Amino acid sequence: MLGSAQVEQQVRVLPDEDGVRVIVCTGDFDQDTLGPLDQACTAAVDAPGVRRIVLDVTQVGFADSSMLNQIIRILRTGRLVMAGPVPPQLGWLLDLTQVRAVLPTADGVEAARAL
């Protein structure tokens, strides 16, 4: 993003625990950089035994409609919980599109695992 501090984008998948897969997102996510997140989300949706997908977005600096689409795709499986606190820019996008109203969100990864 022009004019903002660059944070290296990273998508980490934590080991599954009790049927919960945690995907940790760091950095900026747009159409050109969404590939690793798309792969991690697809693998989580397709994995046998994964009953909940926790998306940790606490370190997301920027997200565009591409990431929003990914969130909605997982949300439709009925297994998504977003771990926050949700960063301001992503929160704005979720509010603008009214996705936040239907998106289960927890304060941190451990709280999301427990839902």
Functional labels for PLM-detected ranges:
Residues 28, 86, 109-111:
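Short, solvent-exposed coil/turn elements at secondary-structure transition points
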Residues 31-103:
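Amphipathic alpha-helical interaction surfaces in cytosolic regulatory modules
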Residues 2-42, 59:
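STAS-typified acidic loop motif
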Residues 101-111:
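Short acidic-hydrophobic, aromatic-tinged amphipathic segments that line or gate anion-handling sites
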